[in-house]
Amino acid sequence: MKLLEFLKRERKKSASVAKERLQIIVAHQRGQRDQPDYMPMLEKELLEVIRRYVQVDQDAINISLDRDNDCSVLELNVTLPRDE
């Protein structure tokens, strides 16, 4: 009985899955398009400076630039390793 239910269930069509994935990619690229040209270089240089003092991975640093009307905020988050 379970086998029949499994075979009869409605599956997502590959087109709808592809559409969802494409929407995620487009939204991500639109978010990056609004950032200044210097952001990738700034992120790289900040990571190099932090690595002089603490060993961190590339994905341990997150930089975001938020803009509200006439104010811009540069936010830097670094996940530091635990001392052992």
Swiss-Prot record:
<dbReference type="InterPro" id="IPR036707">
    <property type="entry name" value="MinE_sf"/>
</dbReference>
<dbReference type="InterPro" id="IPR005527">
    <property type="entry name" value="MinE"/>
</dbReference>
<protein>
    <recommendedName>
        <fullName>Cell division topological specificity factor</fullName>
    </recommendedName>
</protein>
<dbReference type="GO" id="GO:0032955">
    <property type="term" value="P:regulation of division septum assembly"/>
</dbReference>
<keyword id="KW-0132">Cell division</keyword>
<comment type="similarity">
    <text>Belongs to the MinE family.</text>
</comment>
<keyword id="KW-0131">Cell cycle</keyword>
<dbReference type="Pfam" id="PF03776">
    <property type="entry name" value="MinE"/>
</dbReference>
<comment type="function">
    <text>Prevents the cell division inhibition by proteins MinC and MinD at internal division sites while permitting inhibition at polar sites. This ensures cell division at the proper site by restricting the formation of a division septum at the midpoint of the long axis of the cell.</text>
</comment>
<dbReference type="GO" id="GO:0051301">
    <property type="term" value="P:cell division"/>
</dbReference>
